[in-house]
Amino acid sequence: MEDVLAEKLSRVCKFDLPFIPCSIPFECHPDFTRISKDTDAWALRMLSITDPYERKKALQGRHSLYSPMIIPRGESSKAELSSKHTWTMFVLDDIAENFSEQEGKKAIDILLEVAEGSYVLSEKEKEKHPSHAMFEEVMSSFRSLMDPPLFARYMNCLRNYLDSVVEEASLRIAKSIPSLEKYRLLRRETSFMEADGGIMCEFCMDLKLHKSVVESPDFVAFVKAVIDHVVLVNDLLSFRHELKIKCFHNYLCVIFCHSPDNTSFQETVDKVCEMIQEAEAEILQLQQKLIKLGEETGDKDLVEYATWYPCVASGNLRWSYVTGRYHGLDNPLLNGEPFQGTWFLHPEATLILPLGSKCGNHPFITI
């Protein structure tokens, strides 16, 4: 199935990317500059990155900015820890993409024990797997700073994430493209956004949500709607990079694969953009319901959560426009603002020209 999809995609050299509106407010954490600088310094030190190219690649990925861009409120020290956590998970996620099923299961056992504090890495292990050392340091802080119920929820998310990453890796090895519904469920877990977004929002803002609230249907749907918005945006704006590395587990690829043969790739792009808007509408609807519930029951923490959690979606959207992880290094397009236009699928960088453009004389285009 993957080979057939790859052949269809080989004929796609460009598509039109429309403006993606978002009515959810966007703002960074007030201390984002310091948090980003300190987190980057920590990650470079932990990973022993000294090579100039690898350093540039790490810094232009903007990993340290992700958490301050999606969680604009909260205690600075906790926001920095959340940023370190996100940096760590980016590294672990990249490594996990190449796991065999056996390697994945072994890594799951180690990481879960490290997270629980029942296994301490040796110096030799830290040297061999610096990402595990990063993870161990962050988890130690979480265990001491998170309330036990919140940490228990985090651990549940972690187990689901690790299991889903291994499952997805096995599908990729088998060159199997899942159904849209299967992919939706799998992607919610492999994104790890319930933890990176929802739980970190509670943690940074020191919110105490009752078990009956977090298990209520509206709250669960609210969390999922934000996750869906995040992964749809990420799959759309990372498509060039995913195509380059031949990773076909992506909303665009899955929808295109299972669409009728006469469906154009542009129709697939338009469908994903439509799904992003549907997710935003659901977020806003559920936000109002939960704010109203919080006000009626006197649950101030629920009101705070419902007010700020949607910023995960708007912050992720903005971050997805500025990361070199998706768009290539030293790309002048990444000026902090959203972009739209005809996207030429150059392997090294995102290239956008006004809608309807042909390749022309753009200095990067060799298609």
Curated annotation (Swiss-Prot):
Coiled-coil annotated residue ranges, if any: none
Binding-site positions, Mg(2+) 1: D93
InterPro entries named in the record: Isoprenoid_synthase_dom_sf, Terpene_cyclase-like_2
Sequence positions that bind Mg(2+) 2: D93
Inducing factors: Not regulated by alamethicin treatment.
Keywords: Lyase, Magnesium, Metal-binding
Short sequence motif DDXXE motif: positions: 93-97
GO BP annotations, alphabetical order: terpenoid biosynthetic process
Catalyzed reaction equations: (2E,6E)-farnesyl diphosphate = (E)-2-epi-beta-caryophyllene + diphosphate
Cofactor remark from the record: Binds 3 Mg(2+) or Mn(2+) ions per subunit.
Taxonomic superkingdom: Eukaryota
EC number(s) recorded for this UniProt protein: 4.2.3.137
Cofactor(s), names only, from the UniProt record: Mg(2+); Mn(2+)
Pathway participation: Secondary metabolite biosynthesis; terpenoid biosynthesis
Family label: Belongs to the terpene synthase family.
Its job: Sesquiterpene synthase converting farnesyl diphosphate to (E)-2-epi-beta-caryophyllene as the major product, and to two other unidentified sesquiterpenes. Has no diterpene synthase activity.
Additional detail: Selaginella moellendorffii contains two distinct types of functional terpene synthases (TPS) genes, the typical seed plants TPS genes (SmTPSs) and a microbial type TPS genes (SmMTPSLs).
Free-text comment on this protein's domains from its UniProt entry: The Asp-Asp-Xaa-Xaa-Asp/Glu (DDXXD/E) motif is important for the catalytic activity, presumably through binding to Mg(2+).
Protein name, per record: (E)-2-epi-beta-caryophyllene synthase
